[in-house]
Amino acid sequence: MMIKKLVTFEDLGFVQWGVLNEDETGVYSAIALEEAFFTPFPETLFEFVEQGNEGLLALADSLEQNERTGAVKAKPLGTIHILPPLPELHKNIFCVGENYAEHIEEFHKEKGRPLPKFPQFFTKAPTCVIGTEAAIDSHPTVTKELDYEGELAVIIGKTGSDIPVSEAMDYVYGFTILNDITARDLQRNHVQWFHGKSL
């Protein structure tokens, strides 16, 4: 069974994680799957990601058993609160600036600058991450130019360095969507983007 979407959510004040059902109307709780099929799962999705393929195989097995037995019912999305997938990150979020070719050409042509030869990296503080449909704080006393950009976020599943391009995807656990919120005025006022990217 292909596991497509893992989520962290809050249900009756209790934070837990699970997997979306096939029609994406509800979530199978990892706790409920563990109780039904005696498969131990870690408490957080972060810890589950650290298990790599071993964890995914165990989860797939539990979901297949549930498909046969119907022992665990999905919690309807309307009854739970979806949180960021990994709400307690241990490091900053690393980003690649100017990552869209047409946008780069347009931006540098407009400014009369040559195209960059190397990628531009910046980080965002993990404290600025919020969940799906959560209200974005506009910080009106700090910025007058809040902006947003839809980005593809890559979840790295294991440590490594000096990784050959041919092996890069072996280190990718999965993907999610990130709404990159930026205070453009703060970004312009500082050579380092961190402040404008981390409200």
Predicted stretch roles:
Residues 1-115, 119:
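N-terminal non-catalytic cap/leader segment that marks the start of a structured domain
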Residues 90-199:
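Glycine-enriched loop-and-adjacent helix/strand subsegments that border the catalytic/binding cleft
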